[in-house]
From Swiss-Prot:
The active site is at C174. Catalyzes the iterative condensations of 8 molecules of malonyl-CoA to produce aromatic octaketides, SEK4 and SEK4b, the products of the minimal polyketide synthase for the benzoisochromanequinone actinorhodin. May be involved in the biosynthesis of the octaketide barbaloin. The gene is PKS4. The record marks G207 as: Determines the polyketide chain length and product specificity. This is Octaketide synthase 2.
Length: 403
């Protein structure tokens, strides 16, 4: 019997192996699951809670300003993994800049994979196949950096097989929901039979802090961000009658907007994650988004549509002003961002998990309304992630009919 050391495969053998490794079809989204922590906070009374919980009620004028900011966000409520009683145990967290990273880490390190696992369980149940058939796990979060990392902890909580291929995407921010879909596409299409579990989970306590007159960026962040997790099952060549594909991930591209690094940036300090956001962020995004859209269409040999209203839209809701300016720049009808504005109203900005929530909202409403596709009855659409860098993720989607 010959040994492998004496065997020299010819190029045709390698090409045949490579061809056999690849899937035949495009990556598809087959299932979606979401999860919230238990505590719900109405936005119209959030200023009262926030200033009380941070022992800042004496800052009367700052509270009035923060309340006005909250009421302009177009957010109705948000979910958090903490309540006032919980925060009272951590005066260092509710201060503005006292050392608190150890306590924040102790909350986030177990909390992030646990919340992500809740969303994953729902996605796996909807998918309808055994969890042992999951071949890859992509886990994304902007908090709780640790080793073993959150992907390991989530896989352990779910009881995934020990040889699942894991990937952890840390500290990418609000564009990362698009990033993980790009990764999932490459994994599914380059590994025949792969089923990729994608999980995004975010907890805002990594950056929660008391108000400060000299750092209003902090007030904006505290008015926008909420906790949540979302999960997808992504795979190519769906099994007919067993798996139900909803969206084909046709193309996924990332673009860094030149000279925009200071528009949105965050920094981990002993006092937790510090948030900085320029007033120029809506204009920076809206001035560059059309070029990203044109690029993704041309990269697959398609002519960009003359009217952007012919597509369905899943933009990340970085905030009301960003949505308003992108909508105006692309001359979109108000209803085109309907799914995004619904999620923003119901949950706030959940960082990387947000666009996956919007995907879920769109497909559910499309089915409820009896439309021809999961994408509001339209075939083609785009998912957009915006975040630090400034970085834009542009995902071209093809929507399929409900089964």
């Amino acid at each position: 019997m010959g040994s492998l050391s004496n065997y020299s495969p010819v190029m045709e053998d390698v090409q045949a192996i490579r061809k056999a490794q690849k899937a035949d079809g495009t990556a598809t989204v087959m299932a979606i699951g979401t999860a919230h922590p238990p505590h719900i906070f109405p936005q119209d009374t959030y200023a009262d809670f926030y200033f009380r919980a941070t022992n800042s009620e004496h800052k009367v004028e700052l509270k009035k300003k923060f309340d006005r900011i909250c009421k302009k966000t177009m957010i109705g409520k948000r979910y958090f993994n903490y309540d006032e009683e919980f925060l009272k145990k951590y005066p260092n967290i509710t201060s503005f800049d006292e050392p608190s990273l150890n306590d924040r880490q102790d909350i986030c390190v177990p909390g992030v994979p646990a919340l992500g696992a809740e969303a994953a369980v729902k996605a796996i149940a909807e998918w309808g196949r055994p969890k042992s058939e999951i071949t890859h796990l992509v886990f994304c979060t902007s908090c709780g950096v640790d080793m073993p990392s959150a992907d390991f902890q989530c896989a352990k909580l779910l009881g995934l097989r020990t040889n699942v291929n894991k990937y952890c995407v840390y500290m990418q921010g609000c564009y990362a929901g698009g990033t993980v879909m790009r990764y999932a596409k490459d994994l599914a299409e380059n590994n025949r039979g792969a089923r990729v579990l994608v999980v995004c989970a975010e907890l805002t306590i990594i950056g929660l802090r008391g108000p400060n007159e000299s750092h209003l960026d902090n007030a904006i962040g505290n008015s926008l961000f909420g906790d949540g997790a979302a999960a997808l099952i992504v795979g190519s060549d769906p099994i007919i009658g067993v798996e139900r594909p909803m969206f084909e991930i046709v193309c996924a591209k990332q673009t860094v907007i030149p000279n925009s690094e200071d528009v949105i940036h965050l920094h981990m300090r002993e006092a937790g994650l510090m948030f900085y956001m320029s007033k120029d962020s809506p204009e920076t995004i809206s001035n560059n988004v059309e070029a990203c859209l044109v690029d993704v269409f041309k990269s697959v040999g398609m002519t960009p549509p003359e009217d952007w209203n012919s597509l369905f839209w899943i933009p990340h809701p970085g905030g009301r002003a960003i949505l308003d300016q992108v909508e105006a720049r692309l001359k979109l009808r108000p209803e085109k961002f309907g799914a995004t504005r619904t999620v923003l109203w119901d949950c706030g900005n959940m960082v990387s998990a947000c666009v996956l929530y919007i995907l879920d909202e769109m497909r559910r409403k499309s089915v409820a309304d009896g439309l021809a596709t999961y994408g509001e009855g339209l075939e083609w659409g785009v998912l957009l992630g915006f975040g630090p860098g400034m970085t834009v993720e542009t995902i071209l989607l093809h929507s399929l009919p409900p089964v």
